[in-house]
């Protein structure tokens, strides 16, 4: 199976590393998963016989530009690569844009037009125009998978749509942002104020340099929109979510909650057609009371009742785990 990776930051490099590490396993159980092109904002590296993935990672880390890949590197836009390079699947992992969805939206739609399946970790297009993307994929007869867009390594979307097939999902609640969960955990355990806990999260690389989307709840809002649309058949956008972040939470509030048998968590919730992201009181003994950077999602269903999945919600290798699962699904659906 021939693959184009669009976007070669932390997640793109994570996919390359996982495909390299798993190459023997994939060849033995499926077939060779060959990366024939990698693009970033500088250009591309293209080899129809398959790029050397360790070399690609080394070039990117040393020079910052994939176009510097020896002999196979060139100045070429991602759109032109999608149009001109023969491949089965495009893995779209450019940074998420929650305002317009681009460039990822354009990359995905262009892939569909060129009869290429798509796997993405990109929240932007999914949170803004999910219905359009699904309809375009169907129109062009290609598969569109996006497990990695919510919850990193946690199999949330595929669990609900495949393992729980036949169940009606009545509600979804969860902690879907590791940065905010880490900050609240530090505030609770060590009595730190919000600013100190945020500073520590930045120093450890857990929080982004600009953590606004995380701490204001926008990242979680995008994720629950994706879950509402993909699992519960809604047609929501990020504008439909009532959002409140964690910046006003104090260690005193956490202390008082603890005294009463509760903690405070940033919860994303889909229930009765409403989408909410806000700090909520969670019982200490609740499955939703996970610590540190862990994520958790709880489904309320008509048949299986409550189903809970917990896991690492971020990280290049964890996200690559979900992308690999989607790639294998596409192989099983098209190549067998």
From Swiss-Prot:
Enzyme Commission number(s) from the entry: 1.1.1.3
Binding-site residues, L-homoserine: 208, 219
Function text: Catalyzes the conversion of L-aspartate-beta-semialdehyde (L-Asa) to L-homoserine (L-Hse), the third step in the biosynthesis of threonine and methionine from aspartate.
Residues bound to Na(+): 147, 150, 152
Residues given in the record as NAD(+) binding sites: 10-11, 94, 315
Enzymatic reactions: L-homoserine + NADP(+) = L-aspartate 4-semialdehyde + NADPH + H(+); L-homoserine + NAD(+) = L-aspartate 4-semialdehyde + NADH + H(+)
Protein family: Belongs to the homoserine dehydrogenase family.
Coiled coil: none
Residue spans crossing the bilayer: none
Catalytic residues (positions): 223 (proton donor)
Keyword terms: Amino-acid biosynthesis, Metal-binding, Methionine biosynthesis, NAD, NADP, Oxidoreductase, Sodium, Threonine biosynthesis
EC category name: oxidoreductase
Superkingdom of source: Archaea
Cofactor(s) the record lists: a metal cation
Pfam families: Homoserine_dh, NAD_binding_3
Protein name: Homoserine dehydrogenase
Residues binding NADP(+), per UniProt: 11, 94, 123, 205, 208, 315
